[in-house]
Amino acid sequence: MLLATASLKAADQPSLAERLGYKATDKLLIVNGDDAGMCHTANLATTECMEKGFMRCATIMTPCPWFPEIVSYAKSHPEKDFGVHLTHTSEWGKYRWGSVAPSDQVPGMLDKQGYLWPEVMDVYGHAKPEEALIEGRAQIKRALAAGIDVSHIDSHMGTMQMHPAFVKAYVQLAVEFDLPIRMASQETLSKMGHPELRGEISAKGILFPDYFVYEELKDEKKQDVKTFWLGVVRKLRPGVTELYIHAGTPSDELKAITGSWQTRSQEFEVFTNDEEMKSLIAEQKITPIGYRPLRDLQRKERQQAK
């Protein structure tokens, strides 16, 4: 019934693009930079892509050691759009981090060494959704206390987006802080057996892009990253689409942290310097946007609905 109501409401109101001030036929693209704050290289590449490329927003990992650096940039560039990359895992073998919340409040979130679990399934197997909620709230509050004008939230490695109980906590945070969220596509949710989620969340007044592109690079060392992303952008539909990248450069630091440094470096180049991508976006009349317009619209609409 809730889904049906949400569907009727969606059919009666203008599209998200129109509510943002565009035409229903316009193609709006959010290129979000995941993993800001993770390390120095990630910060440098993310900010350069925001300044020179098509990235219009990025999400920050508040538990990570290089969080203060990205905070400094965000505060000195208030026009830039930053959200929180809710981080409930610490996946790199030689570079780890713990929780923002006190460990006694989230014991199930931490391994024997006091770090966040390396895999999403570890989180589901050891932590309660309530602990994920506490940790997520602590991370958002940390960003706000640091002076970041938080525009949206998403989930590192999708931890808060792939299990119904954790999705509930994810949405609770969105409602509590009145923030738009990254949301899996309708096709993905249907495959997961939860086709109703988009309708239920929309009924709460929480906004999310019409479409979400999940990055499926099967072999990071051999996949043609540029061809992959050109294909994605070429197929964009009218409305608001989000895709995410992990911007990086081939630094010794990034090479020491992750085996995906090549993919991260290539994604940075494609969305910052690549002439073919620039031409394609111009030819397709695609408008890059960030999440801040969605946040402002959401807060306006939810206030009007009271």
Residue ranges of model-derived segments:
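Catalytic domains of cell-wall/extracellular-matrix polysaccharide-remodeling enzymes
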Residues: 129-207, 212, 219-222, 234
